């Protein structure tokens, strides 16, 4: 079947929309007509060469409508509205204990370029194209394993929902599934991008007393207030650690670091109170710590969190319900782009002009 896809042909090059071939879905797979796809930092990192092998079709925050189902797929049917999330095997020790985000085959299934049976689905002129996160949603159609797919209600605009598959799931899930803060506790969120602002909305739902957001962009800090932040700090103008400790009388109970910037990670750790806990979400470099002084003597906990410790089939419907109730207005983070403008969408995300770009691919 011929489809149009945004092709990543080599490192650090713009995506090119061209016609390619997609195979029919196999027994455990479905064919989805893509309506829209969010653009995530991980897509941008892959263009730099830090992801799946080239040539590839990227995109891992897809939403669309099922057009065909494999013979082993019983919980999905033609016409279902779906969100596509990360790929997992559902049979390893991590998956069987509910930790699908820590699947033992995570790297292979999401970044290896092949689907679960270790074959390709995308081709052009006799050359195989890598699949990304088991979906490759920067295309008019995608073939994905049934475990990638989350069925959603028909009464919410599909164009909104793709980003729930990664960035928004990561931010909200880190609060709700990983840190699980108590009502009345405090949290500092470093970085007011899509992940950080999703964490703000989740913290607000859970009834935290102090929700402190740190960023360098005033417009994003203003949006953070609108979404539920009780305090915002511009780290270009303030000693963040001192300010957080003033606000909370000694430090926050919890923190989330979304930027990956080493100095910001250190600030996040230092802003914790005794026995505080920080979740590291952003991809970054080395951080120098004195574990005796920074961690041991104050009983602090550092945890790495992937995909918000979320099982997509459980977490995404919950977030959609909060959206319907007006408690999680994630649509305020989104800006829509035509599929042909996908490279501009990447640029606007890089410069900070857009928090969460979404490319409209179909209808």
Where are these regions (language model features)?
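Residues in the short beta-alpha loop(s) of Rossmann-like NAD(P)-binding domains
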Residues: 217, 284, 308
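NAD(P)H dinucleotide-binding glycine-rich loop of Rossmann-like/cofactor-binding domains
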Residues: 22, 93-190
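Rossmann-fold dehydrogenase core element
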Residues: 277-279, 290-332
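Adenosine-nucleotide cofactor-binding segment
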Residues: 189-192, 197, 201-267
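Glycine-rich beta-strand-centered segment in the early N-terminal region that forms part
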Residues: 23-37, 47-96, 101, 150-156
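Short glycine-centered segments of the SAM/dcSAM-binding site in methyltransferase folds
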Residues: 81, 186, 276-277, 301
């Amino acid at each position: 079947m011929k489809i149009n896809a945004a092709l990543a042909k080599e490192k650090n090059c713009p995506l090119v929309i061209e016609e390619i071939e997609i195979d029919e879905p196999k027994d455990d797979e479905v064919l989805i007509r893509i309506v829209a796809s969010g653009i995530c930092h991980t897509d941008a990192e892959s263009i730099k060469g830090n992801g799946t092998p080239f040539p590839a079709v990227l995109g891992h925050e897809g939403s669309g409508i099922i057009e065909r189902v494999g013979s082993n797929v019983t919980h999905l049917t033609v016409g279902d509205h779906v969100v596509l999330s990360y790929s997992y095997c559902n049979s390893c020790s991590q998956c069987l204990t509910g930790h699908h985000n820590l699947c033992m085959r995570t790297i292979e299934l999401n970044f290896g370029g092949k689907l679960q049976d270790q074959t390709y689905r995308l081709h052009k002129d006799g050359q195989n194209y890598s699949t990304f996160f088991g979906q490759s949603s920067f295309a008019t159609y995608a073939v994905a394993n049934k475990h990638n797919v989350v069925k959603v209600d028909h009464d919410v605009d599909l164009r909104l929902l793709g980003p729930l598959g990664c960035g928004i799931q990561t931010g909200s899930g880190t609060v709700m599934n990983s840190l699980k803060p108590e009502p009345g506790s405090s949290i500092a969120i470093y970085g007011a991008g899509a992940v950080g602002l999703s964490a703000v909305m989740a913290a607000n739902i859970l009834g935290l007393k102090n929700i402190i957001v740190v960023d360098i962009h005033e417009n994003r800090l203003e949006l953070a207030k609108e979404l539920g932040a009780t305090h915002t700090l511009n780290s270009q103008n303030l000693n963040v650690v001192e300010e957080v400790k003033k606000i909370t009388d000694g430090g926050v109970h919890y923190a989330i670091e979304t930027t990956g910037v080493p100095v910001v990670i250190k600030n996040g750790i230092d802003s914790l109170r005794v026995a505080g806990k920080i979740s590291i979400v952003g991809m970054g470099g080395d951080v120098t710590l004195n574990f005796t002084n920074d961690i041991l003597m104050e009983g602090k906990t550092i945890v790495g969190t992937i995909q918000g410790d979320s099982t997509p089939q459980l977490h995404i419907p919950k977030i959609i319900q909060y959206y319907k109730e007006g408690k999680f207005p994630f649509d305020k983070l989104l800006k829509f782009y035509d599929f042909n403008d996908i490279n501009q969408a990447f640029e606007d995300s890089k410069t900070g002009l857009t928090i969460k770009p979404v490319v409209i691919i179909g209808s």
